[in-house]
């Protein structure tokens, strides 16, 4: 182990920055904080993505809060997922505490309590700016991925989208999509078959069942209008600070499909909308995905490939993705390899499997002459973390056990009245919280089917009337025998014979 002076020099050189940066805290050696050995993250590398990991109660959420605050202060907007409901306090300044002052004195940083510009958003019926997307915007590829469809079923989904494009039928919500799917094998079977080929009823039945499963997780709340414009995520307030957009997800932890659907839709829309930026001095937007395992658990291979592709490509748009989870093994290796910043809080070894995971995690970090990484991972205290980042030239910085700085904002939830204040001040609620139900595929096809049914009924009535008329004509037209038997001549003749007999 090296001495303090060597360690300080090692950190000072490894974290020397020419451009703008965020200070995370100060390096630690043998459990002691080395004052002014500041651990800095260059802003220009923030679009290289990152990981914040650690056991429950080790300080992951506070680290997320620190990063979000400092990015906002630098004029960079942030989007973060609040699955536990404890991030809304960012809107209010920290009340302060002697322990915070003591921590910052050790780090060598002044502590300045402050609140930040916040926009509260929601995927469900919770209060906040409603986030929605139309099925058309989601597109056939993403919809097939999220439904985990076979190649044949993917083809049917593509045909449904093509039919709607060709016939100018807006696909706004899941009801629209289901209606077209039912129409394809019902009333519109001939129309579809002549234009796109035969569509299997069993395949459409499977797709319908998977859509119903998605609806049961609340996706019907997400699909629809008014569709959210991602440009509204990159707003700056009047003081030049980036808005921190907090999506309240406390009620969807048990609905991972909805979470995955939203995340993929959002990332795809951002990638399609934001201009190419390349390597610039600062990112355009940073996203923090809390409880990241919800995206990766039970995800199909196709879905994981989609996520990996987006992670690779989206950084060129100036977007940084930060996954927050308990264990780095929650994130697939191919995604983990794309992450430039790693903030690892303490891991707990209760089982042989845990110890194996810690050894694997230690191998993800640069070798350090000052630390036994596996040992440090289990001995870190709350609010301490191992940090490995990229310097301004994209090279790994020295591994540093770090005493993390405290958040400047409140480390607790907002009260109901404080949330109401934030919502009342929002400019986006007025824009997005009005539900629109314009004419779409469901209504147009329903009308088309109704019209066809009325015409069929009319034709049926005409045929029935025609039959009745024919029947009446037949009944009034005399049978020749009857005609003879009932004729006056025949009757008179018979009566004449009878008279003769009587005589």
Each language-model region and where it sits:
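Conserved ATP-driven motor cores of ASCE-family P-loop NTPases powering translocation/secretion/packaging/pilus
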Residues: 2-3, 66-68, 91-107, 309-395
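Pre-Walker A adenine-sensing motif
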Residues: 32-43, 233-235
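Conserved lysine of the Walker
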Residues: 60
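N-terminal pre-Walker A segment at the start of P-loop NTPase domains
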Residues: 13-38
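Pre-Walker A (Motif I) flank of P-loop NTPase domains
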Residues: 37, 45-50, 241-245
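The conserved Walker
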Residues: 52, 56, 299, 328
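Conserved P-loop NTPase motor module
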Residues: 1-16, 28, 130-136, 376-478, ...
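P-loop NTPase motor domains
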Residues: 68-72, 76-78, 85-309, 335, ...
């Amino acid at each position: 182990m090296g001495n303090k002076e060597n360690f300080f020099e090692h950190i000072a050189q490894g974290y020397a920055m020419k451009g703008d940066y965020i200070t995370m805290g100060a390096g630690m050696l043998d459990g002691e904080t080395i004052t002014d050995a500041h651990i800095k993250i260059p802003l220009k590398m923030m679009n290289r993505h990152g990981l914040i990991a650690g056991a429950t109660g080790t300080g992951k959420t506070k680290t997320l809060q620190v990063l979000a605050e400092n990015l906002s202060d630098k004029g960079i907007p942030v989007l973060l997922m609040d699955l536990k409901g404890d991030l809304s306090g960012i809107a209010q300044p920290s009340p302060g505490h002697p322990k915070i002052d003591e921590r910052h004195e050790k780090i060598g940083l002044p502590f300045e309590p402050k609140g930040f510009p916040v926009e509260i958003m929601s995927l469900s019926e919770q209060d906040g700016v409603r986030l929605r997307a139309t099925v058309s915007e989601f597109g056939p590829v993403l919809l097939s991925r999220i439904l985990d469809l076979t190649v044949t079923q993917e083809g049917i989904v593509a045909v449904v989208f093509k039919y709607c494009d060709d016939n100018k039928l807006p696909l706004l919500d899941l009801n629209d999509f289901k209606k077209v799917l039912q129409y394809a094998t019902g009333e519109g079977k001939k129309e579809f078959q002549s234009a796109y080929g035969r569509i299997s009823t069993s395949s459409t039945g499977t797709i319908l069942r998977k859509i119903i499963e998605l609806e049961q997780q609340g996706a019907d709340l997400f699909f629809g209008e008014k569709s959210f414009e991602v440009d509204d995520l990159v707003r700056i307030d009047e003081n030049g600070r980036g808005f921190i957009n907090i999506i309240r997800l406390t009620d969807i932890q048990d609905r991972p499909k909805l979470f995955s659907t939203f995340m993929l839709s959002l990332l795809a829309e951002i990638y399609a909308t934001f201009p190419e930026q390349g390597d610039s001095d600062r990112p355009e937007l940073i996203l923090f995905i809390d409880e990241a395992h919800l995206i990766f658990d039970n995800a199909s291979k196709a879905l994981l490939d989609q996520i990996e592709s987006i992670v690779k490509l989206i950084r060129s748009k100036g977007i940084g993705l930060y996954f927050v989870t308990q264990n780095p093994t929650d994130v697939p290796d191919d995604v983990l390899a794309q992450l430039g910043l790693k903030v690892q809080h303490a891991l707990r070894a209760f089982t042989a499997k845990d110890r194996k995971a810690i050894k694997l995690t230690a191998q993800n970090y640069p070798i350090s002459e000052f630390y036994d990484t596996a040992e440090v991972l289990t001995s870190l205290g709350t609010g301490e973390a191992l940090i490995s980042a990229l310097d301004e030239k994209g090279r790994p910085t020295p591994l540093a056990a770090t005493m993390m700085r405290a958040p400047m904002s409140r480390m607790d939830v907002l009260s109901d009245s404080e949330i109401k204040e934030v919502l009342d001040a929002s400019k986006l609620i007025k824009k997005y919280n009005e539900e629109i139900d314009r004419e779409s595929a469901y209504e147009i096809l329903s009308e088309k089917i109704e019209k066809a049914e009325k015409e069929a009924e009319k034709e049926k009535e005409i045929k029935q009337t025609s039959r009745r008329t024919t029947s009446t004509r037949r009944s009034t037209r005399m049978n020749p025998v009857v005609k003879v038997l009932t004729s006056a001549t025949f009757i008179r003749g018979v009566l004449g014979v009878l008279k003769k007999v009587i005589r």
